[in-house]
Structure formats: structure tokens, C-alpha cells
Amino acid sequence: MSRIKPSMSALLAMLPLLGLTLLTHTSRVHADDVPVIDITAKRFAFSPDKITLKKGRTVKLRLHSEDVTHGFFLRPLKLDEEIPAGSTTEVTVTPQQAGTFTSICDHFCGANHGNMNMTIKVEE
């Protein structure tokens, strides 16, 4: 019984720290107020393969690679990102030009690499 009490005391002492950590994280997300779009790169496709953005509205793209190193290149939005194998790259962008654009993987990732692209539509 006495072995449980020190463990329980330690656990109870840690709970406020855990709550403070969660509160801080939640506040940072709300304070940022920038929409996040998750994009997954996997041989030989991006998912989703189409997204729509608003001209002049800032958005954060969270680029994940599930397998090998990929690229994310889109000249009109001045994006040229490397997504290392098994990791995540974040980029913040504010589109200044309306239109429909094609982003490509510009890092050779295998035989069907040339077909790896996605459509990004920027609306007024």
C-alpha cells in the first residue's frame, strides 16, 4: 500500500503541468488563426490532389512524406519545398494571383514521378 502512495503523489503533482502544457498548446493554435491544409506525398501522388485557396488569404501547408523524399514546386506561389522521407515540412503562403495551377514533385521519386502533381485553385 505504501508503494502506491508515492506513485500516486507523483502523478498528482504532474497533473497541473500536463494541464498547463495542453492549455498553452491550445492557445497557440487559436492565436495563430491561420488555416492549415495537410497534404500527403506518397509515390506517386499528392493527397488531396486538389485544393482551393483564396487570393490574399494566408494558409499554412503541412506537407507530409510517407515514403521517400519528395518535392513540392509551384512557381506562381513561389513554392519550392523539399519534403524529406518520413517527415513533415510546413510552409506559409499568401496567394497573390488567382487562377488554377499545377504543383509538381520536383524530386525524382521513382518510375511514375512525372505523373505526381496536384491542382491548386486560387479564387478571388
Predicted regions and their residues:
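Cleavable N-terminal signal peptides
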Residues: 17-18, 29
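Extracellular/periplasmic metallocenter environments
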Residues: 85-124
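Edge beta-strand plus adjacent loop/short-helix module at the start
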Residues: 30-48
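Beta-strand-rich interaction surfaces with strong enrichment in secreted/lumenal proteins
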Residues: 49-51, 78-82
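Bacterial N-terminal signal peptides that target proteins for export
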Residues: 2-15
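Beta-strand cores of secreted/periplasmic/IMS beta-sandwich domains, seen most often
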Residues: 34-36, 49-68, 87-97, 122
